[in-house]
UniProtKB/Swiss-Prot annotation:
Pfam families: PTN_MK_C, PTN_MK_N. GO terms for molecular function: growth factor activity; heparan sulfate proteoglycan binding; heparin binding. GO terms for biological process: cell differentiation; defense response to bacterium; nervous system development; neuromuscular junction development; positive regulation of cell division; response to bacterium. It comes from Xenopus tropicalis. Disulfide bonds join C36-C60, C44-C69, C51-C73, C83-C115, C93-C125. Its main location: secreted. Keywords: Antibiotic, Antimicrobial, Developmental protein, Differentiation, Disulfide bond, Growth factor, Heparin-binding, Mitogen, Secreted, Signal. Gene3D superfamilies: Heparin-binding Growth Factor, Midkine, Chain A- C-terminal Domain (2.30.90.10), Pleiotrophin/Midkine, N-terminal domain (2.20.60.10). It is found in: Secreted. The gene is mdk. The keyword Disulfide bond applies. This is Midkine. One of its GO terms (cellular component) is extracellular region. Residues 1-21 form the signal peptide. Secreted protein that functions as a cytokine and growth factor and mediates its signal through cell-surface proteoglycan and non-proteoglycan receptors. Binds cell-surface proteoglycan receptors via their chondroitin sulfate (CS) groups. Thereby regulates many processes like inflammatory response, cell proliferation, cell adhesion, cell growth, cell survival, tissue regeneration, cell differentiation and cell migration. Inhibits mesoderm formation and promotes neural formation during development. Plays a role in development of the neuromuscular junction (NMJ).
Length: 142
């Protein structure tokens, strides 16, 4: 009888301690809630080179926070990594400049970034013209 009572007390103690530990862990995961609503975020600064993982600093009143961010390595540096644009198809090749042009309209500005409403992108004209395939290649009946 004493062994049974001891086991029950031990089990209850174990459950109480583990539930308290879980509660403390949950509270530790929550960061201090801020009453700030008007955050001003800076641009994403990469940790090395000009793309990849980095940090972004934000301020609100006297509070400062840093967030992890990522700059894609194929971004157009002239437009900024926080400005997302919807681009049209490439235009015809301009023989005098040797370039194609397309324009884009602002789709989304992340972190209140200062973005241009419309932008233009250029690329050199390709030297060869691509021929369209004349049919499916592969196995099959002719």
């Amino acid at each position: 009888m004493e062994l049974r009572a001891f086991c029950v007390i031990l089990l209850i103690t174990f459950l109480a301690v583990s539930s308290q530990a879980a509660k403390n862990k949950k509270e530790k995961g929550k960061k201090g809630a801020s009453d700030c609503t008007e955050w001003t975020w800076g641009r994403c600064i990469p940790n090395s080179k000009d793309c990849g993982a980095g940090t972004r600093e934000g301020t609100c009143k006297e509070e400062t926070r840093k967030l992890k961010c990522k700059i894609p390595c194929n971004w157009k540096k002239a437009f900024g990594a926080d400005c997302k644009y919807k681009f049209e198809n490439w235009g015809e090749c301009n023989a005098t400049t040797g370039q194609k042009v397309r324009s884009g309209t602002l789709k989304k500005a992340l972190y209140n970034a200062d973005c241009q409403q419309t932008v233009e992108a250029t690329k050199p004209c390709s030297l060869k013209t691509k021929s369209k395939s004349k049919g499916k290649k592969g196995k099959g009946k002719e």
